[in-house]
């Protein structure tokens, strides 16, 4: 009877050792599977970060283009308002447009200028142009000038990031005529 209990305990011990071995094997497989899933998730996270950085860069470039176009629209609007005032006979003082600079990365650069002239005679000339080029960055330019006693100019430049600088000055000359009755 003692021998049968010993045999029974040995069988239980063997069965428990087998269960332990099976549990260790299942644990190792689960650990390998978890490590594989972790590696896949880390790869997906790295790819998501790269995609996010690329999308952020594209967004910043689009915002820079939008800013430049907004500046150009504001400049043309001011030029048109100045022309309307000049044609209606109202005096136009000096007008300045200020634009907050936005820098993304690297450096920034900009250029602007203004000029004025007056003379006799009448005439009106308008010229304008804008361009856009893309090559690991972007560049925008625009220009406008009008004659008839006034010259107006603006400039915009961008390099290695983004910036916008506009200087816009309007000068007018006026004369008064007095009529005499005889």
From Swiss-Prot:
Protein origin, superkingdom: Eukaryota
GO CC annotation terms, alphabetical: intermediate filament
Region (Coil 2) residue spans: 1-83
Keywords: Coiled coil, Intermediate filament, Keratin
Region (Tail): 84-182
Domain IF rod: 1-87
UniProt site positions, description: Stutter: 27
Listed Gene3D superfamilies: 1.20.5.170
Pfam families: Filament
Ranges of compositional bias, category Low complexity: 161-176
Disordered: annotated span: 158-182
Other information: There are two types of cytoskeletal and microfibrillar keratin: I (acidic; 40-55 kDa) and II (neutral to basic; 56-70 kDa).
Quaternary structure annotation from Swiss-Prot or TrEMBL: Heterotetramer of two type I and two type II keratins.
Family statement: Belongs to the intermediate filament family.
Protein name: Keratin, type II cytoskeletal 59 kDa, component IV
């Amino acid at each position: 009877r003692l021998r049968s209990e010993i045999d029974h305990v040995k069988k239980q011990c063997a069965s428990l050792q087998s269960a332990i071995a099976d549990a260790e094997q299942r644990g190792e497989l689960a650990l390998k599977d978890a490590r594989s899933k972790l590696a896949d998730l880390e790869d997906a996270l790295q790819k998501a970060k790269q995609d996010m950085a690329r999308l952020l860069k594209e967004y910043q470039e689009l915002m820079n283009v939008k800013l430049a176009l907004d500046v150009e629209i504001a400049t043309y609007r001011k030029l048109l308002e100045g022309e309307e005032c000049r044609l209606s006979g109202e005096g136009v003082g000096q007008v300045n447009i200020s634009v907050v600079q936005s820098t993304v990365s690297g450096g920034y650069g900009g250029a602007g200028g203004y000029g004025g002239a007056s003379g006799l005679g009448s005439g009106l000339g308008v010229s304008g142009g804008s361009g856009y080029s893309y090559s690991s960055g972007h560049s925008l330019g625009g220009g406008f000038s009008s004659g008839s006693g006034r010259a107006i100019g603006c400039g915009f430049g961008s390099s290695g990031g983004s910036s916008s600088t506009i200087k816009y000055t309007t000068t007018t000359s006026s004369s008064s005529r007095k009529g005499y009755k005889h």
